[in-house]
């Protein structure tokens, strides 16, 4: 007979195993800093080097925002947000420029000057690609209520019927070449695959 604590541990392990990883691919030529913020938890500043990568296990049960800044200080008006939520084994995700866009321009938004993208390797998922210098309100939040303020549907993407056991790739300066790493000093392989 299982005890309540054994069942609780098994349920927790199943929840953790059900989610993939949130991966930041920084294709920019400069470092960025990220903060992972969820309900009741927030990380300190995490440096992601130029042409580098950061990964963390995805959280389920509450929305998570990965806030991106060009400095090690998180200041309102100067950060981009990659956001995701896993609810009832369904992943939802979006990009928000609400804290940095000025009108139709995302030029003040970290990582956006070179384009931003968000996707999963799972083909059932939608994908976001907001190219550099483009106004892309159907791909990212420029205002907090696009239906009311712009007459556009919410730019939230999902993976219909695919569950949540997958990675979610968030790319800064997405117009640049994908990240590569050397294998045995002889060949380059795609870090983002």
Q: How would you label these PLM feature ranges?
A:
Residues 25-47, 55-64, 69-193:
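Extracellular low-complexity, O-glycosylation-prone Ser/Thr/Pro/Gly-rich "stalks"
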Residues 1-21, 187, 191-193:
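Fungal secretory targeting signals
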